[in-house]
From Swiss-Prot:
This is Thiamine-phosphate synthase. It comes from the Bacteria. Its EC number is 2.5.1.3. It comes from Geobacillus thermodenitrificans (strain NG80-2). It is an enzyme of class 2 (transferase).
C-alpha cells in the first residue's frame, strides 16, 4: 500500500469526526453510525479522560468502530496509541506535540496515514519533515472537548501558515461548528474536525450533513 496522496488526504479531511466512549451518553457505535450516514469522511478514535477505557476494553471498542468505518469505506485513525493502531491494523495515527515523536511514529507505521498537531509554523515544518500526511491546527475556537487545550488562536493562524508557504493538508480543530466552518475553510483549512458538534448533537446524522454542506459550499466560493 502506498502513502495517501495529498489530494486524497485533503478530500478525506473535509468532515473529520473524532470521538471516544467519553464523548456521548449514547453508545459510541450508535453515534458513529449516524455520523457516517450523515457524510463523515474520516474518523479518529480518541479514548481520553478520567473514565477512558483501557486495555482489552479499549481495543474491543476500537475494533468495533473500525469495523463500522470499514463498511462505509471511511479510514479509521487512532489518537495517541501507536501500538494499538498497529495491533488492529488501523489506517493511521494522530500524535500531538506531547506524544511519541512523529519521526519515530512514521518509522513504525510505514505508509499508514500520519497526522500531527501543530500550533505554529515551526511545529508545522517539523511535522512535514517528520513525514506527516496532514496537520491538525487549533484550537481555532474555545473547546470543552480537550481539558488541556491551548488558548484559542482564531482562523488567523490558518491564514498565517498558508502565507508562510505551508502547503500540507490542514484540518482545523477546536470549537468548530457548521456556522464557523466557512471562516476556517476560507482561511486555508482543507477540512474541519469536530467532537461535540456531532457527538453532542441531538441528531448526529443531521449535524454531520450540515458540516459537509458548509465545507462544500465554502470550497465553491
Ligand atoms: N487529537 C487531535 N486530532 C487532530 C486532528 F487533526 F485529527 F483533527 N488535531 C489535534 C488533535 C489534538 O492532539 P493532541 O494535542 O495530542 O491532544 P489529544 O491527544 O488530547 O487529542
Ligand atoms: Mg495526543
Amino acid at each position: 500500500m502506498a502513502r495517501i496522496t495529498s489530494e486524497e488526504m485533503k478530500e478525506r479531511l473535509a468532515v473529520y469526526f473524532i470521538m471516544g466512549s467519553q464523548n456521548s451518553e449514547r453508545p459510541a457505535e450508535d453515534v458513529l453510525k449516524e455520523a457516517l450516514d450523515g457524510g463523515v469522511t474520516l474518523f479518529q478514535f480518541r479514548e481520553k479522560g478520567s473514565a477512558a477505557l483501557e486495555g482489552e476494553e479499549k481495543e474491543a471498542l476500537a475494533r468495533q468502530l473500525q469495523r463500522l468505518c470499514r463498511t462505509y469505506g471511511v479510514p479509521f485513525i487512532v489518537n495517541d496509541d501507536v501500538e494499538l493502531a498497529i495491533a488492529i491494523d488501523a489506517d493511521g495515527v494522530h500524535v500531538g506535540q506531547d506524544d511519541e515523536d512523529a519521526r519515530r511514529v512514521r518509522e513504525k507505521i510505514g505508509d499508514k496515514i500520519l497526522g500531527v498537531s501543530a500550533h505554529n509554523v515551526e511545529e508545522a515544518r517539523a511535522a512535514i519533515e517528520a513525514g506527516a500526511d496532514y496537520i491538525g491546527v487549533g484550537p481555532i475556537y474555545p473547546t470543552r472537548s480537550k481539558d488541556d487545550a491551548n488558548e484559542a488562536q482564531g482562523p488567523g493562524i490558518l491564514r498565517h501558515l498558508r502565507e508562510q508557504g505551508i502547503t500540507i493538508p490542514i484540518v482545523a480543530i477546536g470549537g468548530i461548528t457548521a456556522d464557523n466552518t466557512r471562516a476556517v475553510i476560507e482561511a486555508g483549512a482543507d477540512g474541519v474536525s469536530v467532537i461535540s458538534a456531532i457527538a453532542s448533537a441531538p441528531e448526529p446524522k443531521a449535524a454531520a450533513a450540515a458540516l459537509a454542506t458548509a465545507v462544500r459550499e465554502a470550497n465553491l466560493r
